[in-house]
Regions:
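Conserved catalytic network of the ASCE P-loop NTPase/AAA+ motor domain
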Residues: 11-15, 26, 36-37, 71-74
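Active-site phosphate/ATP/adenylate-binding loop shared across adenylate-forming ligases
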Residues: 1-15
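Short beta-strand-centered segment that lines the nucleotide-binding/catalytic pocket of NTP-utilizing
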Residues: 1-3, 23, 47
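Switch II (G3) loop of P-loop NTPases
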Residues: 17-31, 197-203
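Acidic, Mg2+-coordinating active-site environments of NTP-dependent enzymes
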Residues: 41-196, 221-224
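A short acidic, amphipathic alpha-helical/loop segment
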Residues: 30-33, 90-94, 211-215
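AMP-binding/adenylate-forming
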Residues: 18-22, 34, 39-46
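Active-site beta-alpha connecting loops in nucleotide-dependent enzymes
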Residues: 179, 201-242
Length: 242
């Protein structure tokens, strides 16, 4: 927000090569204001969904509000876009109009610049094969959650601009720790019973909840019962009934 972005920028050192900032919004113009402060060389739009939708008439208005960061990316800079997203073409056109280079990532869209080719289970872990530009690269990851794979693809798209990703260690994403409340797994004890808890309580919107349920479905539990505890989904405004 208007406090977090300046604080993050002030925390950067003149010796830092890169700065990574998250730009949030719940109304039109907020990303425009913040991205004008940042003047990013590279921008990333992960996806468009009904998060913080209370101040928008429809999801296209959300997509247009997110696109404000593209307009404020430096000329000849880069925008990283999800080719599987419904508004990919819209954002791509805006980038072209503003002389911004586009790098796409995806799982379903096989024309993506950075795309998932295959995923193979190896014991309790997974090997993902990624195609980026004209080469393939494999990485080991600890789970096959779709949102996690999308994040990896987006990160690789960013890194491919300045880094030779073929030289990355195959375990570079393996030990990534999920932030608390965003799908982290812990073991708790209630009434002397051990319970495996997957915590997704940080925030909720239709897409993140769908991802959480799909991820939970992948967790095998033959000996134990599985429960899904759902709380309120806020900031949807008139879209709540939908």
């Amino acid at each position: 927000n208007k406090y977090g972005v300046p604080l993050s920028l002030f925390n950067l050192s003149k010796n830092d090569n890169y700065g990574v900032l998250e730009v949030g919004m719940d109304k039109k113009g907020e990303i425009d204001y913040l991205s004008k402060i940042i003047k990013p060389d590279i921008s990333v739009i992960t996806n468009i969904n009904y998060a913080h939708a209370k101040n928008f008439k429809n999801i296209k208005d959300i997509a247009l509000a997110k696109s404000e960061i593209i307009s404020n990316t430096k000329p000849n800079g880069f925008v990283i876009l999800n080719a599987d997203d419904n508004f990919f073409r819209l954002h791509q056109k805006i980038a072209t109009k503003n002389n911004i280079n586009t790098i796409s990532f995806g799982i379903k869209n096989h024309k993506s610049d950075v795309k998932l080719i295959s995923i193979i289970k190896i014991d309790n872990n997974f090997k993902i094969n990624i195609k980026a530009k004209d080469f393939n690269k494999s990485f080991l990851i600890s789970n096959n959650f779709q949102n996690n794979i999308y994040n990896i693809l987006a990160a690789l798209a960013v890194m491919s601009i300045n880094i030779d990703i073929t030289k990355l260690d195959k375990k570079v994403f393996f030990n990534f720790t999920t932030p608390q409340g965003r799908g982290d797994l812990s073991r708790i004890k209630i009434n002397k019973k051990n319970i495996n808890l997957i915590d997704e309580s940080y925030n909720s919107n239709p897409l993140s909840l769908k991802s959480a349920i799909l991820n939970y479905d992948k967790v095998k539990s033959k000996k134990f019962k599985k429960y899904l505890l759902l709380g309120d989904m806020l900031e949807l405004g008139t879209h709540s009934k939908k």
